[in-house]
Amino acid sequence: MDESMYRPHTRSVVHLALLINMLSLGSLMMVMPLGPDFISALSMDAKNIGYISGGATFASAIVGFLAAPYLDRFNRKHALIVLLTLRFGLTAACMFATSQTHLLLLFILAGCVAGPASGVLMAAVVDIVPANERGKQLAYVGMSFSLAAIVIMPLSLELAHRINWQAPFYTFGLGGLLLVLLVLWRFPSMPPAHRAQQGSSPTTAPASVLHELLASPLFLLGLTIMSLQMFGHFLLIPHFSNYFQFNLAFPRDDISLLYLCGGLASMVTMQLCGNLLDRGYASRTIVVTTLLLAAVILCGFVLPFSLSLYLVFTLFMALSAARSSSTLAITAGIPLPHQRAAFMSYQGTAANVASGLASVASAAYLSTSAEGKIDGFSQLAIASAVFALAAMLLTLRLIPQLAERSRKMAASQTAQATGQ
């Protein structure tokens, strides 16, 4: 693909990707803290609140997996318009729910579209951004997670508190539909024809797409790395709030400030690491962020050090985000142009499944003491550090393999040009 033809649209696409991901992620994340509002307004059983977020996550993973082989067969712009309209339209429709069953159904349906939409969106970003700028630009798009935690979650709570529980759904749903109009206006047309010349036909059978990817050791290695990272990460993430309050006696009212500090620090470290990746320091970036992250986990949650929770949590969030965005930029080099949307969708599926399994496994492992404290968190912290180190070692194995493949492809293209 000739990236220069899309160069004038790069900034528009990257900015739109950030905003779309922020709204999409935020609308998924907001339902857990809105649980008490659902209980009072819809008479929802407290134990069913977890099914809303969990159901949407697994639905996104399943549909993302099933849809992946088809995603590269369509014009990226047209696919995005359809998928995002469904995604945010269903989110807005949640405001009409009159029972917990209706809300569960509508929100899970919205989650079904989230996986394929994210895959196509990220593939479009990778298509447009030159390879030597991907670290910085993907780190910029990766800030959407931090912004969702900093902006969308507090705003959703405030809207629900001041208006009603429906307000976050129609606010962010309609906001997402406005972004669809911006996609229609500012996004370049990206037909599959321009990708076919670099790989296979855009009409390749879905089964062939899956078989082609599964036959690639790089693809399997990339999915394994992402799965290990997300599994280790979500051994801890779902239980932080309870652990901080019940084990560390951290004030409930200060939890939001804690996440604000972590989110702001994450935005800084992601941009820093993105710049380092573009300068060719991929291996060093992964090693430094992972080793520091493992040290923070062990010193903050395992070893008997009396460190400030603000320091520990801020470093944890900042290093986790930097490592994740760096890994995403590295693995973005795995698929060929005609495989990108499928790969991104499969990668999202792997991440969702791994995080879901980790959440369930960690919840089953932890127990509550007679004093109301959580037992077993330090063991989970050790396991999280081990998974982080394992993912680091595999990433260090992936980087030279990608470089070697790039050299071979460049040599092959040079030979073909010479022959002509």
Where would I find each of the regions flagged by the language model?
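Cytoplasmic helix-loop-helix junction between adjacent transmembrane helices
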Residues: I108-S144
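A late C-terminal transmembrane helix in Major Facilitator Superfamily
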Residues: H338-A370
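Conserved MFS/SLC helix-loop-helix module at the cytosolic interface between two early adjacent transmembrane helices
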Residues: I62-T98
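Juxtamembrane intracellular "pre-TM" segments in multi-pass secondary transporters
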Residues: D2-R7, M190-L223
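Helix-loop-helix hairpin linking two adjacent transmembrane segments in secondary transporters
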Residues: Y140-F187
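C-terminal transmembrane helical hairpin of 12-TM major facilitator-type secondary transporters
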Residues: S283-T327
